[in-house]
């Protein structure tokens, strides 16, 4: 399963998202905006402009930010709504 994390340096929620993915056993590719990918390429890959990072894509599905990532895994029964692994 392909997981992409679009991030920026010194982003607290980017660190949290990557930590959650690692704790759940997911491997991911990180694309740091303005280092690995331009802002224009970032918007093009997502298909729409967004204002926050991280932005996570799992198996081609745009999940969204850290909060949406926790909701995604909570809905799948992998974590509770506090972000704790079940």
Name every feature range the model reports, one short phrase each.
Residues 47-57, 66-67:
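Structural micro-motif
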Residues 8, 33, 60:
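Conserved residues at beta->alpha junctions
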Residues 1-29:
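Local sequence-structure signature of Cys/Sec-based thiol-disulfide redox active-site neighborhoods
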Residues 58-86:
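Non-catalytic, surface beta->alpha helical segment in thiol-disulfide oxidoreductase systems
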């Amino acid at each position: 399963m392909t997981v992409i994390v679009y991030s920026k340096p010194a982003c607290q929620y980017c660190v949290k998202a990557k930590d959650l993915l690692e704790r759940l056993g997911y491997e991911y590719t990180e694309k740091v905006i303005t280092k690995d990918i331009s802002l224009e390429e970032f918007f093009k890959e997502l298909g729409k402009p967004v204002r926050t990072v991280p932005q996570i894509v799992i198996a081609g599905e745009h999940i969204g930010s850290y909060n949406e990532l926790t909701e995604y895994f909570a809905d799948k029964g992998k974590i509770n709504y506090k972000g704790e692994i079940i």
